[in-house]
Amino acid sequence: IRLSLVGSEMCIRDRVTVVNFWYAGCAPCRVEAKDLESVWREYGGEDVAFIGINTRDQADTAQAFSDEFGITYPSLIDVNTAEAKLAFSEVVPIQATPTTLVLDKQGRVAARIIGPIDGTSILSTLVKDALAETP
């Protein structure tokens, strides 16, 4: 799977991938932002990818949110076409924001968290479990 970001591409094939649907005015998104960044800093790298999918904001607003909360993993803006949201709709409809998905190395949804993550432990465990899976 390839995701196009602003001016670049990100390959998530053979990687555990955390996908977080968010927007700047979402109060629970603001609460979970630092925890998501912590898990990204702990696991992000060759084996784990993180991608934020902003469902409502323009690029300037999304960037201001990332700057305010120290978010270093990439996000894409999915406002005009909702292509990213639609890509998951047949497998796991995104009905609330925030929603966080953990995809296994085969790109299958291994876990879904509806609403804010509550601290780092649950997401860390889900990422560890997905990394430990053998195809």
Mark where each language-model region is:
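Single conserved hydrophobic/aromatic residue that forms the stacking wall/gate
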Residues: 1-7, 11-12
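N-terminal targeting signals for export/organelle localization
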Residues: 1-2, 132-135
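Short cysteine clusters
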Residues: 11, 26-29
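Hydrophobic beta-strand anchors of alpha/beta hydrolase catalytic cores
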Residues: 18-19, 50, 100
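Aromatic-flanked redox-active Cys/Sec active sites in thiol-based oxidoreductases
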Residues: 20-26
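Structural microenvironment flanking redox-active thiols in thiol-disulfide oxidoreductases
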Residues: 30-69, 80-88
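Thiol/disulfide oxidoreductase modules built on the thioredoxin-like
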Residues: 67-71, 80-131
